Curated annotation (Swiss-Prot):
InterPro entries: dUTPase, dUTPase-like, dUTPase-like_sf, dUTPase_trimeric. The keyword GTP-binding does not apply. It comes from Swinepox virus (strain Kasza). GO terms for molecular function: dUTP diphosphatase activity; magnesium ion binding. This is Deoxyuridine 5'-triphosphate nucleotidohydrolase. GO terms for biological process: dUMP biosynthetic process; dUTP catabolic process. The gene is DUT.
Amino acid sequence: MSLYVKCVKLSNNAIIPNRSMSGSAGYDLYSAYSYTVKPYNRILVRTDICLMIPDKCYGRISPRSGLSLNYNIDIGGGVIDSDYRGEIGIVFINNGCSDFNIKVGDRIAQIIFERVEYPIMEEVKCLEDTERGNSGFGSSGM
C-alpha cells in the first residue's frame, strides 16, 4: 500500500520534496530564500512547504552527507509529527570556518518518512537484567 504525503507550496520559490535517485531513502528539502550563514552559527532556513504526513508516520529531518563532508554543515534534530501542518523549517548549522551561502532552490537537508509505534508507558520498580546491564557509552566496543 502506497503512502501519500500531501504538500502545499507557500510561494513560487517552494519546491516539492523529491528523491534524487530511485533508491534514495530521503526526499530533498530546498531553501525558498537566500542566506549567508556565518561560521559557527545556525539559522532557520525556510522551505515554504507544508506537509500532511500520514498517521502512524513522522518525518525525520537529516543532513545531506555531501554538505557534512565537504563544508562541515550539520542539521539540527528535527521530527515532523503527523499532526503538524505548519511550514517545514530547517535548523542549518555552519560548523565551518568560513561563510556558507545558500541560494534559492539549494538542497539543504532531507526528510525521511518513518513509521512510528506508540507504546504504553508502564512504571515498574526495576528492570529485568541483561548481559550489558547499565553499561553505557562505548560499553559494546569502539
